[in-house]
Regions:
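N-proximal low-complexity "stem/linker" segments adjacent to membrane-targeting elements
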Residues: 1-26
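Conserved acidic residues
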Residues: 4, 32, 84-86, 94, ...
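Histidine-centered beta-alpha loop that forms part of the nucleotide-sugar donor binding/catalytic region
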Residues: 11, 39, 122
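Acidic donor-binding segment of Leloir-type glycosyltransferases
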Residues: 21-65
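A generic secondary-structure signal
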Residues: 23-27, 53, 78-82, 107-108
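Short, acidic/glycine-rich phosphate-metal binding loop used to engage nucleotide
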Residues: 64-72
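Catalytic-site signature of metal-activated, phosphate-bearing donor transferases
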Residues: 72-80, 87, 96-189
Length: 189
């Protein structure tokens, strides 16, 4: 079975990272790991203390610091370079994947052995969303209140030396040979 690094980026989202890790930890399979990278220049003391406690409690948790410096590609490449998994599932601390997706992630990878990059749909919701926001930003909002769905993300990819991130802002992934898109359904978000 393939192993996965759940690679999480965090800065000051203590409540959100706690919720995400409480969700992910019991779902890890053998040889999976959780890798958390924090922004050295923006992390709060509370988040850092929490991460250090987690690292001491779980042998499959790694915590690394790295300066973001407004360079998201470099930040994600450092995350990739610290991962041990064959595949990387990259997620921000304030995101929470669907339980169905995480429960079936290994099977989805095994069913697509030749694929380097998986586009994963994402559900965006905005608290306090107004018509003014929608018009100003040109957003599309569906009947469920999801913004710009399916908002495909390059969230799952094979860890190779060729695959890497480029572009300081609005970073994109390059170096892959094959890709697929998960179904545009809520359970795959």
């Amino acid at each position: 079975m393939v192993n996965i690094t759940y690679a999480i980026t965090v800065c000051n989202e203590l409540e959100e990272i706690t919720k995400l890790l409480n969700f992910l930890q019991p779902k890890l399979k053998e040889n999976d790991e959780i890798l958390i990278q924090y922004d050295e220049d923006g992390v709060t003391r509370e988040v850092l203390d929490y991460l250090n406690i987690l690292k001491s409690l779980h042998s499959n948790h790694k915590v690394v610091g790295f300066p973001l410096n407004n360079d998201f590609a470099n930040f994600k490449n450092n995350l990739k370079n610290n991962a041990d998994g064959i595949f990387i599932f990259q997620i921000d601390a304030d995101e929470l994947p669907n339980e169905y997706l995480i429960d079936n992630l290994h099977q989805l990878i095994d069913s697509n052995k030749e694929v380097d990059l998986f586009f994963v749909p994402r559900i965006n919701t905005v608290d306090g969303l107004t018509e003014e926001h929608i018009n100003k930003w040109g957003w599309n909002v569906n009947e469920k209140g999801w913004v710009n769905f399916p908002d495909l993300q390059t969230r799952l990819y094979r860890r190779t030396s060729e695959i890497e991130w480029e572009g300081k802002v609005h970073e994109r992934i390059k170096g892959y040979n094959t890709l697929t898109i998960f179904p545009l359904q809520e359970e795959f978000c």
